[in-house]
Amino acid sequence: MEQTYQYAWIIPFVPLPVPMLIGVGLLLFPTATKNLRRMWAFPSILLLSIVMIFSINLSIQQIDSSCIYQYVWSWTINNDFSLEFGYLIDPLTSIMSMLITTVGIMVLIYSDNYMAHDQGYLRFFASMSFFSTSMLGLVTSSNLIQIYIFWELVGMCSYLLIGFWFTRPLAANACQKAFVTNRVGDFGLLLGILGFYWITGSFEFRDLFEILNNFISKNEVNSSFGTLCAALLFTGAVAKSAQFPLHVWLPDAMEGPTPISALIHAATMVAAGIFLVARLLPLFIVIPYIMNFISFIGIITVLLGATLALAQKDIKRGLAYSTMSQLGYMMLALGMGSYRSALFHLITHAYSKALLFLGSGSIIHSMETIVGYSPDKSQNMVLMGGLRKHVPITQISFLLGTLSLCGIPPLACFWSKDEILNDSWLYSPIFAIIAWSTAGLTAFYMFRIYLLTFEGHLNVHFQNYSGKQNTPFYSISLWGKGDSKRINKNFRLLKMNNSKSSSFFSKKPYRSGKNVRNRVGPFLTIVHFENQKSYSYPYESDNTMLFPLLVLGILTLFVGSLGIPFNQELDILTKWLTPSINLLHQKWNDSIDWYEFWKDASFSVSIAYFGIFIASFLYKPIYSSFPNFFLINLFVKTGPKRSLWDKILNGLYNWSYNRAYIDAFYTTSLTGAVRGLAQVTHFFDRRVIDGITNGVGVMSFFVGEGIKYVGGGRISSYLFFYLSCVSIFLLGLYFPVF
């Protein structure tokens, strides 16, 4: 066992050879490396599988012994300062390593097929492997300096993957938005690290916790300054985990490929903020007010994320706001001091959300058959519907993830979310009411996504939902370029090559470039109905994409058992996290009162079923061929006057669809102010700074010209200069001014 911990330092570096070899290969042998690009998926998956096996071994040992191991290498620069680097193995590290590796492997297997026809295949796998390396380095770090280094590397990888299709303006803007927003949090994190180093003189977690605890108990540190430093540390987690008010980058990050959305939302970037707060929780507990602040930010994010997801039409943006809300639950649990329930929900949510995002990728992949490679259309739930008949395996897996996130037993998220909801009553009744209400909203918007996607009829063939079929086709490449081409509707077989692809629903022409996926075999199959109209339909994804859905579906079914006690013994998660922090349950019993548990659980399940019922009532098409796409459609009156209720619903829809106008507020206030400041700075630089510099140059020129004539060797110039000086002297002597 000791040897296992001694060699744990290699965990972050095992996936690193893949991006290094890809970079060297592209530099020295670019043609051969590109021709053999598909082979790089195997070493990426293999190396991450080795880390997963190692992490499983560590986790088993942690469950059996609950030991904490830390190894440190010290580099002494002088007698007063030394740099220490090392790694820390504890229950939190083993849990995060398991999440990163298991979800990462599933995403890599999925991506091999999803990204097979993309020209950036090599760049994608290099970035993904380096992403795994950075995240594994973050969770094994033993001090704040290492945390910050890997924190920045995780951010860098996420920016590279969010802006993966950088020729698309929306993707480039999303990358910049994520970068700028996270700069705010990262700057606060850096200031907080420096502040605590100034207080304690150490970056090591153990030393930091012990010294700060002693200082606070003896009242040797300014509490206001300590609270400020803790709030700055928390700012980094707020930005990384998309908590209010630094959440605005998360929905725009959906411009990246769907597999990276799954990895970011399940086990890497947004989980990094939760990990940081969990790692520093012993520090936050001893500082006044900071725990209340964490729970306050968490509950706001819970409610805001759920309400913003209500009216989204983009399937990935809806799931993104769902992630934001669920991360708010985790942050709320950490702020309440319920360490176990926060990590439990982190585990269950990771597998459920990875399943949902990979399922959405399969849906998008199938919709691209019809609408082309246009994210505005392939991700638009308005154009979907009736996919249950065409992608049954994807539908079943997506339904599992949806029910899990809704909190339906016995799926994973039911067990973890129910713990957080019950703990919220012990912490604050107001927070509990908001948390329980949001549980109903979660069930509503998740089933709304499911119903709009899989139930009813395929709506892409109809324009404005009135039954009018579009006749022209258009295409748009994966890189944002497109080409218009009219195609005979009676063709039974359509094929796509490098420069042509086809789609329904738009009359807008696009010009096609060369960056289009190559696909072998028929592109569209046109089915003739009785009215002799031509249609095409989605198809199920390949087995390589369905296998990760199967594995994640099984995990979603059974991972909740980690937190269920059997035979009056401690559950696996409690053994795993022993000793852990739990401020709400100071006297934790080994046994559980199942009667009390099911009594509390029945209320949360009832709320979830109520949300599902409302969503089914509003969005499931029963009598009409088309579902009601907007929340207000059932309440719109034909008369000239609209009731107050209609106006409220319309305002709620607009508020949700427009992201609560927070982005608009930032644009008008912060962006406008920064632009105005930049213009003032530009004017000052050009007119004042450059004016002084240019003025000195012009003055030097004229002075030089004057000296040149004085000392030019001409007697007349000397006499003129001499007589002028004498005249000025005499005038000053005989006609004094004062």
From Swiss-Prot:
Family: Belongs to the complex I subunit 5 family.
Reactions that this protein is recorded to catalyse: a plastoquinone + NADH + (n+1) H(+)(in) = a plastoquinol + NAD(+) + n H(+)(out); a plastoquinone + NADPH + (n+1) H(+)(in) = a plastoquinol + NADP(+) + n H(+)(out)
Chief localisation class: plastid
Translocase is among the record's keywords: yes
Places the protein is found: Plastid, Chloroplast thylakoid membrane
Keywords carried by this UniProt record: Chloroplast, Membrane, NAD, NADP, Plastid, Plastoquinone, Quinone, Thylakoid, Translocase, Transmembrane, Transmembrane helix, Transport
Organism: Ligustrum vulgare (Common privet)
Transmembrane segments: 9-29, 40-60, 89-109, 125-145, 147-167, 185-205, 230-250, 258-278, 280-300, 327-347, 354-374, 396-416, 425-445, 546-566, 603-623, 718-738
Protein name (Swiss-Prot/TrEMBL): NAD(P)H-quinone oxidoreductase subunit 5, chloroplastic
GO cellular component, one term: chloroplast thylakoid membrane
Annotated gene: ndhF
Function: NDH shuttles electrons from NAD(P)H:plastoquinone, via FMN and iron-sulfur (Fe-S) centers, to quinones in the photosynthetic chain and possibly in a chloroplast respiratory chain. The immediate electron acceptor for the enzyme in this species is believed to be plastoquinone. Couples the redox reaction to proton translocation, and thus conserves the redox energy in a proton gradient.
Listed GO biological process terms: ATP synthesis coupled electron transport; electron transport coupled proton transport
Enzyme Commission code: 7.1.1.-
Keyword NAD: yes
Recorded superkingdom: Eukaryota
UniProt GO MF annotations: NADH dehydrogenase (ubiquinone) activity; quinone binding
Subunit structure: NDH is composed of at least 16 different subunits, 5 of which are encoded in the nucleus.
Topology versus the membrane: Multi-pass membrane protein
